Amino acid sequence: MNLYGLVADIGGTNARLALCNLENGVIERIETYSAKQHAGLESIISHYLAEQKTVVTYACIAIACPINGDWVEMTNHQWAFSISELKRTLGLEKLDVINDFTAVSMAIPMLTEEYKLQLGGGEAVKDKPIAVYGAGTGLGVAHLIKVDKQWVSLPGEGGHVDFAANSEEQDAILAVLRRKFGHVSVERILSGSGLVNLYQAIAILDHRQPEDLEPETVTQRALDKSCQYCHRALTLFCEIMGRFGGNLALNMGTFGGVYIAGGIVPRFLDFFRQSNFLHGFEDKGRFKPLVQQIPVYLITHPQPGLLGSGTYLRQQLSLID
């Protein structure tokens, strides 16, 4: 067997590629490319392997979209491809293409304590269901369950469920966003663009003309308190992150923990920890005592998508006990 397998984490903005040591799962030689600068996935993979002067026969690619059959179309990018054709073109013996949050979920059993920050709740119960979600370009969601000796990821498109307003203020925001989008999914709020949507809706409700800001600008103005609408948007973002996470905890009784991934929250971690996130997570009425037992963590590993892709590949090759 070739010592290395190719692993990739393909998002709407960036494509991260690496080699996974199939014996021990260590992720090596990580490179990040702009998805906008390449015509397609085959181009990026070929470029990476040429740079590394490496030939691989096994690969696992995590990608930000539903995987239903051979044809794959990305949700937040124009790329589309055939899995079988990509496998043939790259000369691979095995190619697994999985949802990006399938990969993130598969990383969780491999995380050491240094790569997870507990935000609340009790102790995780061994081998119980796990939930993971994260805001970035979009909102990813997955669950993880233990079946016999293997972890099985249950991916889905949970970011596209209806946004559930929980106050009069949120009702008003929902009405503004409904006029703009029609269907308002929770991803319209819990994502980079969603943070901007929140800011703009809050400004409109105060009869002001919102600026066309980038998510990073909304965050910065919130943190330095130079814009009351940005500050309120980030405050609500944190609370709604908690409410959504608490919903996931209830859905499957995730006593193994609820994990937050994604690139947004670490940018304002101190603000997040002092926010109403945990209140939102636990505010489940009669079931508050139950949810308070469930631990909630922030994943601090720099590349959980690559780590999880490697774990998935090694498990498929029966290299993990």
Curated annotation (Swiss-Prot):
This is Glucokinase. Its main location: cytoplasm. The keyword Nucleotide-binding applies. GO terms for molecular function: ATP binding; D-glucose binding; glucokinase activity. GO terms for biological process: glycolytic process. Pfam families: Glucokinase. The keyword Cell cycle does not apply. Coiled coil: none annotated. HAMAP family: Glucokinase. PANTHER family: GLUCOKINASE (PTHR47690:SF1). It catalyses: D-glucose + ATP = D-glucose 6-phosphate + ADP + H(+). InterPro entries: ATPase_NBD, Bacterial_glucokinase, Glucokinase. Gene3D superfamilies: 3.30.420.40, 3.40.367.20. ATP binds at A8, D9, I10, G11, G12, T13. GO terms for cellular component: cytosol.
